[in-house]
């Protein structure tokens, strides 16, 4: 299972690095436990999602809301169907011009079919929320 998990995440990050968000979305299962905790009243792209259509909406809102300057995955740890990726990101909020620079971790679970069933992103949500404020 660890090899399947690693292969799925390698493909996910490869697609993301080329801007293929449609392709990355296809790697998710039909039903997903997705969350990016934070101030959902201020930041429209964060919060829970439950299926591919909602994940697609996330990427659309993200692209409208910010410019992705960097998204560097530094390490990926895999244990069976579970994985954690850690890294750093830098983005610019389109509406304010403010920069978000933060470490992040991503928790994943991958099923027997190689589909992502869990995605939990942890980042400096306070910094993100303040960056969208004028």
For each of these PLM feature ranges, what is it?
Residues 29-80:
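A solvent-exposed, acidic/Ser-Thr-rich amphipathic alpha-helical stretch
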Residues 4, 60-134:
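A beta-strand edge to alpha-helix "cap/lid" segment located at domain peripheries
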Residues 1-2, 44-48, 97:
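Alpha-helix initiation/capping motif
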Residues 16-26, 48-50, 67-72, 121-125:
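Phosphate-binding glycine-rich loops and adjacent basic patches that engage nucleotide phosphates
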Residues 10-19, 42-46, 61-66, 86-88:
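Short, mixed-charge, low-aromatic patches
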Residues 12, 24, 32, 51, ...:
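Hydrophobic pocket/interface hotspot
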Residues 1-30, 133-134:
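Short, low-complexity N-terminal intrinsically disordered segments enriched in polar/charged residues
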